[in-house]
């Protein structure tokens, strides 16, 4: 093996990660958190297919930390974890735990923001929410940290067919593989926000041993 190849394989292996949050194995968390997060368990989606829930999470120590940590140049962590009393009690206080795939969602939303050229606002309960959240009836990418409900873009509120369909088209043209809910009132549709998701993505950090 050439020295160039060895260097390429080893480059960065000893670098200190610059992301400030600690990675935790959900199976090692206290019981109250394991019950709420259900790490690694299977959960049926609306079609009856089994989806495996995330096992690895970032530990968020405080709301102050969430207000300061950038997931991308224009999105802070707090924007993805706004929940209310519908979330399970252990997950309404700190420390909080968010699936590691949340960083992938932030990168996609950053690209979407570049495409629309203005601020993108995530709804309360519209970012990450646990499988124990009252909105979580079936497996939803929100519980994987890979879905966001956008209620406003710039000065435009997404509460009409024209607005939702306009920005849905931009999202699909900008983000390969993104899924958006169609406009409407039946289950599986959206009439007051733009739903974007990457599907059921599991993220296992590189330094995880198991």
Predicted regions and their residues:
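Catalytic cores and adjacent binding grooves of peptidoglycan-active enzymes
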Residues: 4-18, 139-210
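Active-site acidic/histidine clusters and adjacent loop/turn architecture
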Residues: 56-116
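Extended, low-complexity, intrinsically disordered C-terminal regulatory tails
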Residues: 104-137
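A broad, structure-centric signal for solvent-exposed, well-ordered loop/edge residues
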Residues: 60, 67, 78, 131, ...
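N-terminal start-of-chain detector that recognizes signal peptides
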Residues: 94-97, 119-125, 165-171
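N-terminal secretory targeting signals
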Residues: 1-58, 210
């Amino acid at each position: 093996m050439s020295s160039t190849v060895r260097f390429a394989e080893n480059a960065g292996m000893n670098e200190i990660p610059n992301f400030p949050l600690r990675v935790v194995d959900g199976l090692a968390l206290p019981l109250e958190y394991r019950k709420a997060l259900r790490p690694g368990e299977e959960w049926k989606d609306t079609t009856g297919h089994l989806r495996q829930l995330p096992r690895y999470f970032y530990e968020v120590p405080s709301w102050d930390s969430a207000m300061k940590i950038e997931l991308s140049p224009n999105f802070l962590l707090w924007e993805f974890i706004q929940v209310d009393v519908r979330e399970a009690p252990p997950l309404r206080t700190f420390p909080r735990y968010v699936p590691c795939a949340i960083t992938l969602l932030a990168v996609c939303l950053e690209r979407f923001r570049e495409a629309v050229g203005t601020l993108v606002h995530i709804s309360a309960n519209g970012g990450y929410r646990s499988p124990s959240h009252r909105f979580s009836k079936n497996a939803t990418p929100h519980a994987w940290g890979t879905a966001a409900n956008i209620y406003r873009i710039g000065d435009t509120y997404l509460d009409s067919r024209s607005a939702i369909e306009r920005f849905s088209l931009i999202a699909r043209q900008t983000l390969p593989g993104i899924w958006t809910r169609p406009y409407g009132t039946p289950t599986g549709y959206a009439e007051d926000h733009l739903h974007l998701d990457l599907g059921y993505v599991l993220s296992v950090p590189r330094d995880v041993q198991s």
